[in-house]
Regions:
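Beta-strand-enriched, solvent-exposed domains that form extended recognition/catalytic surfaces
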Residues: 40-141
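Active-site nucleotide-donor binding segment shared across nucleotidyl transfer reactions
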Residues: 188-217
Length: 585
């Protein structure tokens, strides 16, 4: 009998390991979703003018018919006879006025025996199903008496739906957030020459009440750029964010602002960038209620005021800016105010640069996170006994999986675009002849080849290892990288890929919008592997390997080997499941 080729030996080893893993994996189909509760009323029937339209885990939303010239009317949210929150609803012309109650924490204290009502005076508004009250289906997690005690002690439901002290009574918050503001003010002024000033809810509280809004949850500031071109404004905002990170601040980039926290991540302020365009109109990425432009001749510069026990900057013509931001009813307190509902205009060209947001956010992530234990995917791949001589860890992060492959005898090259990740990986102290880490833009054509060409030649059998890489880059970058794999992979080389799969719902919108995270359809990856001449060893979807918080993440794994030319080894038994969710180690 002829000696087996190296690829055939790999297949045989992988087949045995695959069988062992498959026997250990238990598969279960997801439980069917419970049927939706039918509505009690005829959907074709006319709806009352004043009503509750939506009840969710986060909010209760509805409309109130008030009349054009009516005074603001108070609506109160009750659990049984306990008044939990109230809003004063200002008239909205001929149309009914919208209202909203934030309810995230309230539901912890309510169960099927409780009755939720929204009342104008003593009269309840009809619920979405037409009844005068709503009862939750889930059991209460805490006694209602605890909610009553917390409200009696002065706590309120803030604009996120959380129970907390009003910000004007929370001295600890005021001291810590104004200390952070002072540090950020100094840094921003040194970097770009501008002072951050109060805006949005913080400015509204300062102007209307002379203190922070009780129901607010953050500290809003902005700086006014001297540039008029949106691209120059965006570039300045990006430079500022990176410079603040270099000074030790935690900085997250969002579409409309940056979130800045101190080194201990105890408090946060939001920093927006404002600018006047060539037409002398103020441009705001977050937007304003008023759609009438705020013009440059209305801007009167900054002044220092006392706010939350500290000296801060605020616009001199503050009332005019507040009226632009919040509209003509800004003097009426409205804890249920909703930007999604009330916003009149926003300047999309003023948004923080989309291409730069993932760069800043991944840098911030690796500056403040470190992981010691290898991932379950590293255990899975190493357990297949593929025995590569070289592992190229693509998007290696802080190199948490590298020690596992080094212990198995492989040399590892870790590549990542984020400087903080590469520096963290290098601090692992692995021997340089066994592991090295380089910064590399894997989306750039030829970048991977350049890194491989710099290694001692000829290269041993290589495993291209990509955990959470294909679901963190754009479609175009993914196509570029797969083309690189196809061009570089030699007979006997291997590829291992793990990505979030279609159907995964654990990604926060911030991860999708600002970090480049996404889910990946495994079908094109499967087709590409076949078209590129790889033989698949593992093709498996599962939700038992990783969690986002307490929720399992739906993943898909591929491990494949490129056969040696001229050899025809038996196709290995594959670990595969597309419709079932398997437990993993």
């Amino acid at each position: 009998m002829a000696d087996r080729s190296p690829a055939a030996s790999v297949y045989a080893s992988a087949r045995r390991a695959a069988g062992r893993v498959a026997r250990r994996l238990g598969f279960r189909r997801p439980a069917p979703a419970p049927p939706a509760r039918p509505a009690r009323t005829d959907p074709a029937a006319p709806r009352p003018a004043s009503r509750v339209d939506l009840i969710s885990t986060r909010e209760i939303v509805g409309v109130l018919e008030a009349g054009r010239d009516a005074a603001p009317q108070r609506l109160t949210l009750f659990v049984n006879e306990l008044a939990v929150d109230h809003v004063d609803v200002a008239p909205a012309g001929e149309a009914p006025a919208a209202f909203r109650f934030r309810t995230r924490d309230m539901w912890h204290y309510c169960g099927p025996k409780d009755r939720i009502t929204v009342r104008r005076g003593s009269d309840p508004l009809p619920m979405p199903d037409g009844s005068p009250h709503h009862s939750p289906t889930a059991k209460a997690k805490r006694p209602l008496s605890e909610l009553e005690e917390r409200l009696a002690a002065g706590e309120i439901i803030n604009s996120r739906g959380n129970l907390s002290l009003p910000k004007y009574l929370d001295a600890t918050w005021q001291q810590s957030v104004t200390r952070l503001y002072g540090e950020v003010d100094q840094a921003v002024h040194e970097i770009i020459g501008h002072h951050p000033f109060l805006v949005y809810g913080s400015l509204l509280g300062a102007v209307r009440e002379g203190r922070p809004l009780g129901h607010d949850h953050d500290f809003d500031t902005a700086y006014l750029s001297a540039h008029t071109d949106p691209e120059e404004v965006a570039a300045e905002a990006g430079r500022l964010a990176l410079a603040l990170q270099e000074r030790g601040f935690s900085v997250e980039a969002r579409a409309t602002c940056i979130h800045i926290a101190d080194a201990g991540l105890t408090e946060r302020i939001d920093l927006y960038h404002f600018f006047f365009n060539d037409s002398d109109e103020l441009r705001l990425a977050w937007g304003s209620v008023s759609d009438i432009p705020f013009r440059k001749d209305q801007w009167a510069g900054l002044e220092q005021i006392q706010f939350a026990g500290a000296t801060v900057f605020a616009p001199r013509n503050a009332e005019a800016l507040v009226a632009h931001l919040y509209g003509p009813n800004w003097r009426v307190p409205n804890p249920g105010f909703s930007w999604e509902r009330e916003r009149g205009t926003r300047a999309k060209e003023a948004a923080f640069p989309a291409a730069l947001r993932p760069v800043i956010n991944w840098q911030d992530h690796w500056l403040h996170h470190a992981f010691d234990a290898p991932t379950s995917f590293a255990h899975c791949v190493d357990g297949l006994q593929l025995a590569p001589g070289l592992v190229v860890d693509l998007g290696c992060g802080d190199g948490r999986d590298v020690p596992r492959f080094v212990r198995s005898g492989a040399r590892v090259l870790g590549l990542d675009y984020t400087p903080a990740a590469v520096e963290s990986a290098r601090r692992r102290g692995l021997a340089q002849d066994r592991a090295s880490f380089e910064r590399c833009d894997l989306a750039a054509p030829g970048a991977l080849r350049e890194q491989l060409d710099a290694l001692p030649q000829p290269l041993p059998r290589t495993l291209f290892y990509a955990r959470h890489l294909l679901d963190s880059i754009s479609d175009a970058a993914r196509a570029t990288l797969l083309a690189e794999f196809e061009a570089l992979a030699r007979p006997g080389d291997m590829i291992a890929v793990e990505s979030r799969a279609l159907g995964d719902d654990t990604l926060h919108y911030h991860e999708r919008l600002n970090c480049g995270r996404r889910v990946v359809d495994p079908s094109p990856i499967r087709d590409w592997l076949a078209g590129a001449g790889f033989e698949t060893v593992v093709d498996l979807g599962g939700s038992g390997w990783e969690k986002a918080g307490s929720k399992p993440v739906l993943l898909h794994r591929f491990v494949a080997v490129k056969p040696t030319a001229g050899s025809s080894p038996d196709r290995p038994s594959r670990i595969s499941s597309v419709t079932e969710h398997g437990g993993g180690r």
